[in-house]
Structures are given as C-alpha cells and as structure tokens.
Amino acid sequence: PPSLFSFVVCSIDEEKFAALSRTIATRFAGMPHEVIRIPDAASLCEGYNRGFARSRGDAVVYCHDDIDLLAPDAAPRLARHLTHPDFVGVAGATRVTGPAVFWAGHPWLHGWVTYHAPGDADYEVTAMSLDAPLVTEVAALDGVFVACRRDAAAAVPYDEATFDGFHLYDLDVSYRAHRAGFRLAVACDLGIVHESKGDFGAEWSRYAARFRTKFPELSAAQGSPHFYAARVPTAADVLATQRRLAEIAAGQGRRIPARTP
C-alpha cells in the first residue's frame, strides 16, 4: 500500500474544508496521510499543480471539498485499488467522444456516486452501471475524487494554461493520461457522497469549446448519459443499497478484474 496519501483540495469554504478534513481523519486514521489545502486557487488546474508541488505522498488524491466517504474501510479499499491502476476515480467512462466525461453515453459509463446536498431529506444513490467493484480500461475520470500514483501524476500535470477556470480540467488530464498509456479505473465501493451534480452552463460551454479545439477528433454526437437512482433516508441505507447492488453485480458475473501489469 502507499506509504503516504496526500490529499490536495482547493477550498475557499471553511465549513466544507473542516468537514472534509474530519472525514479524511476518520477514514484514513490507520494510514499516514496529509491534507494540503489551496484556499486561493486561480483555477482547479493551477491549484492542483501547486498542491502537488507541495505534497510528499506516493499516492496523491485530488478531490472536491464537498464530499464524504461512507465506507468505513474506504482507505484500505482505495489502497488495494491502487495496486495496479495508476489513476482511480469514482466515476468515469471507458470511451471519450466529446467535451464531457460522460459525453459518450451508455454503455461506456461507470461509477456509483450518491448525492446529498445540505438540507436534503434523502440521499440519492446512483449507479451508472452494475460493473463493480473496480472497473478497468477506463479512458476518462470525473474530477470529484481521483487518486493516483505520484509518478503518474508527475507525468501528466494539469493544463492550467488552457483550462484556467473550473471546468473540463478533469476530462483533459485523465484523457491525456489514458492516451499516454497510464491505467485508469473506477472504484464503486468507497461510498462517496457529493453535494453537487455539477453545472453545465455558459462557463462550461466556453471550456468545452477549448477542449474541442485541443482535441478536434472528439466530435461525436452526445450519447445518453442517464443513470439509475434510489432515494434513501440515511447514510446506513446508502451503504445497504450499494451492498445489494454489489450482490446483484456479482450474481450476474459483472465484476471486472483489475488488469495486471
């Protein structure tokens, strides 16, 4: 397992950062870790590159500040998942055809992410597919949570010149990593919860145009990025629902083994 996990977080929100720090301290209590906060990032790319330069870990985790990890053993699970892949996210696609991680649509989308904004009565448990617990041969990762080996992160820095805002940073870096021959995977068993589903407004469109300019060959029509969801009242119900999904996936022989080097 990694000897040190370095979490790099761009956060201007004291409350969110404090909550995330508590989550990391709890889940990674048995593993050496550090949390590097960038409170004044010019962009996510700039902040992540600056945070990486300050980090010391042989495993680096880039994540948003509005997440939770419900699985009690999320840390050892993540450590196991990093045995073979170079990058491990929680949602992604095995095919890239346009300016969004999930642009290709099904059947290429994977990941189990739960959504729960402050004040929500219920948790929305979603599943992109029944491939679990680790999906390999991935070509792009959503940036909500991405863990990677240090050498891989060093080889593929974030493009802060092109993506000088808060959109497309994740698709760009993960797709370049995939094209460079690094191994990407999606972990479905960390119990991740995210407060936000993302914003695809005018700012996203501006950076989508930059992505199209950088990768003109990715010009396919958008596929269907639908997902399936169940609303449950508690965090315990989230984990119970995901355990049931895992049982169904295993029963259908849908477990995708990690690829050996």
Say what each PLM segment does.
Residues 123-148:
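A recurrent flexible, glycine/aromatic-enriched loop bordering the glycosyltransferase active site
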Residues 68, 72-112:
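Conserved donor NDP-sugar-binding/catalytic core segment of glycosyltransferases
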Residues 140, 154-178, 182-193:
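Donor nucleotide-sugar recognition loop
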Residues 1, 13-29:
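Short, well-formed alpha-helical segments that are part of the catalytic scaffolds
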Residues 185-205, 210:
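Active-site donor/metal-binding and catalytic loop motifs
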Residues 60:
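Short aromatic/hydrophobic "clamp" motif used to bind/position activated sugar donors
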Residues 56-57, 142-156:
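Conserved nucleotide-sugar donor-binding
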